[in-house]
Amino acid sequence: MPNPFVCRVIASIFLLIFSQQIQAAELTIDVLDSTGSPIENAVVYAEPDNKSSIPAANAIIEQRGKQFNPLVSVVQAGTDVTFPNFDSVRHHVYSFSPAKTFELKLYSGVPTSPVKFDKAGTVVLGCNIHDYMVAFIHVVDTPYFAKTNKLGKAVLRDLPNGNYTLKAWHYALAKEKEIVEKQVLVKESQTIVMPLSLKPFMIPAKK
């Protein structure tokens, strides 16, 4: 006959897991410009009032075809990023951004160590050899983040119920340091529109 105490413990664990699943919601965010057109590659993220203990995951930004891939990345503060070079030529990756200043001098293949991005902010990447190579890393203080697709949509999943500051960023913001934000109470899944004002911005053409 099963031990009643063990049965109660198991039941409590299942109840806890089930209740957490019920309380988790998702936000669908539509990011639009001043004409109502969708914005691709916008970063959206939700900062909870109570700090999350979810650890940062690792990330990869490739160099392939003398371009960074992806153009835009979003990572949680504390993330280790690896910069593999798959080209037949060497690259010299660097950034002078206040959020992370670093350089990986001329190399091919995979660097021996990743770069840790431990401060929130925007990091602009370049190559000291190919000045048309550019990419952006937006470092955030939350595990709840996503990037918009061609339809301007992004989904933040598994958000515990509570109060959040929802923020949106894009590398072509009209006011470079003015991140758009909204206060959001998450109790159930919902769709939110985030308007952004962008300035003309041309990614350098590959030579």
Segments predicted by a language model, with ranges:
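Structured interaction patches on ligand/partner-binding surfaces of diverse proteins
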Residues: 103, 108, 140-147, 171-193
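A short, amphipathic beta-strand motif
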Residues: 27-33, 44, 83, 152-154
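A short, Gly/Thr-enriched small/hydrophobic beta-strand-prone motif that recurs across taxa
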Residues: 23-34, 200-207
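Short, surface-exposed beta-strand/beta-hairpin micro-motifs centered on an aromatic residue
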Residues: 112-114, 151-158
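A short, solvent-exposed beta-strand micro-motif common in secreted/extracellular proteins
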Residues: 44, 79-85, 162-173
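A glycine-anchored, Pro-Gly-centered beta-turn/N-cap motif
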Residues: 121, 160-163
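Short, ordered, surface-exposed loop/turn motifs in non-cytosolic proteins
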Residues: 35-51, 55-56, 88, 131-136, ...
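Short, acidic Ser/Thr/Gly-rich low-complexity loop/linker segments typical of extracellular
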Residues: 56-67, 71-75, 106, 144-151
